[in-house]
Amino acid sequence: MSIILDNVSYVYGQNEGYIKQALKDINLVIGKNEFIGLIGHTGSGKSTMTQILNGLLVPTTGNMYFEGLDTKEKNFNKKELRQKVGLVFQYPEHQLFETTVFKDVCFGPKNMGLSQKECELRAFEALTMVGFDSELFY
């Protein structure tokens, strides 16, 4: 897997009259099997860049390429990108959206297209692996 950012910029509020440049002319290559971390002050563009890398935002200018494909193309498969690029939100409470821990952990496998039974099996294994008592699952 490779990701290339080519002169990527992102501006918030461009159509509303409130303009805030979050990223400007970012060039980055993330090669196969590489991991990156982003650090910086509040408002420096970390969350914006992460959302672009995950396909949640599209660059205002410039291009992002995943496996050589331009992510702005109409037929680009964002699901495949999101299966390969992980995202942890800045505020953990924003990433929980189910009514139980078990259902929340099932979301990832379900989003990958696995059967309900396989999702539940994987969630059970993952929660058990990290030491959750099965009484807390439901």
Map each language-model feature to its residues.
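A short, flexible loop at the N-terminus of ABC-type nucleotide-binding domains that lies
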Residues: M1-S2, V11-D25, K74-N77, Q116
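The feature captures the beta-strand-to-loop junction immediately N-terminal to the Walker
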Residues: I39-H41
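Helix-to-loop junction immediately C-terminal to a conserved catalytic motif
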Residues: N54
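Conserved ABC transporter NBD signature motif
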Residues: G62-E73, L81
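Short helical segment in ABC ATPase nucleotide-binding domains corresponding to the A-loop/adjacent helical element
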Residues: E93, F102-K110, E120, F124
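Conserved ABC ATPase "signature" region
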Residues: K117-L136
